[in-house]
Amino acid sequence: MQAQRLPPTARLTGPTVRLDPLGPQHFDDTWAWVNDPESARLTGTTTIFTAEQVRTHLAAVASARDRSDWAIVDRTSGTYRGEIVLNDLDATNASMNVRIALAPGAPGRGIGTEAMTLVLDHAFADLRLHRVALDVFDFNVRAQRSYRKAGFVVEGRCRQTFRTADGWADSILMAVLADDPRPTLR
């Protein structure tokens, strides 16, 4: 990975989900869950977004070349299931961050694991990245399990990074390297 810019976001297709480049056409689906309290809790989002902020964000990510944002779509029903993002491009070190947010009702079906596997296949085979990292709150055990299934390993823990209604949550740092063993859908 030498370029400071990514190629245009590609559509990625797996057995049960399709990842479409995220853009303004996804406003209604995004708006339907972006301020959902449980989604906010799991992602650590403390902002209540306005419709205008969501529209501006979707327009910006559609043309960004330092990140790739996808809508997660169920291939059978065409239902929007969330979004997944490769961001924080470090071209010198061929690394990026990944984050995923599933819409209410989507978790627990393998959708997130499949979407993550598709993005990792793309990151390592097409973008030639060396490392993809993420962080997840310690209380989000289901997400941690999904990330391990996709090939991520725990690299560390940052203590008490997020205040919850019950106290403090730690952030678990996870990453996967291009040559780490992991499942593939290709």
Summary of predicted features, one role per range:
Residues 1-106, 168-169, 173-186:
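GNAT-family acyltransferases
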Residues 29, 97, 114, 131, ...:
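Amphipathic alpha-helical recognition patches that constitute DNA-binding helices
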Residues 108-110, 128, 151, 166:
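Glycine-centered helix-boundary capping/hinge motifs
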Residues 112, 116, 139-143, 160-165:
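Short glycine/proline-centered loop/turn elements that form peptide/ligand docking sites
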Residues 125-135:
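Conserved GNAT acetyl-CoA-binding A-motif
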